[in-house]
Amino acid sequence: MKTSLKSAPSQIKKSIDIIIFDETNSQLIMNIIPDTYSYSIYKTRPVEFTITLPIILRLIFNLKDIKIFEQFTTNKGFFKNILWQFLCIYIKSYIQIVKPKAVITSIDNCTKFAWLSKHMQDIPFIAIQNGFRLSYALDNSLYHCQHLFCFGDFEVENFPKREW
């Protein structure tokens, strides 16, 4: 996993209207955001860490969200799962400091986005479907999305049944 570390407090823009989660297809999302809204891209490839005192304090407070024996990601060992949760908690802390009005992604099946959507109910998380889902047979109990813009009626009918 590639990472990038920043420590300058000036690099955090507070009170951004929209965070685009992941740079994949971010240009498409930027094209539909009205000019009256500010936005920034939260890059996940490589993961960017911005370290400031407010983020560290929020991170410590949010450590209560770590679930030691709950499996949030599939096919990962115990320690990878804990590190993955820690990463999600860091991103949650970052988002809480920035205070966006919404978080949008085109990676609708991203497990980090799903975790954040489930654990941050006070901010709308919006996913735009990026692919055709042929089967719901897999265990998707880890998936959660507050708002999904999708391709057709199949998802509209099945999404609520799966309690996502």
Language model features with spans:
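Active-site and donor-binding regions of nucleotide-sugar-utilizing enzymes
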Residues: K2-Y37, Y42-W164
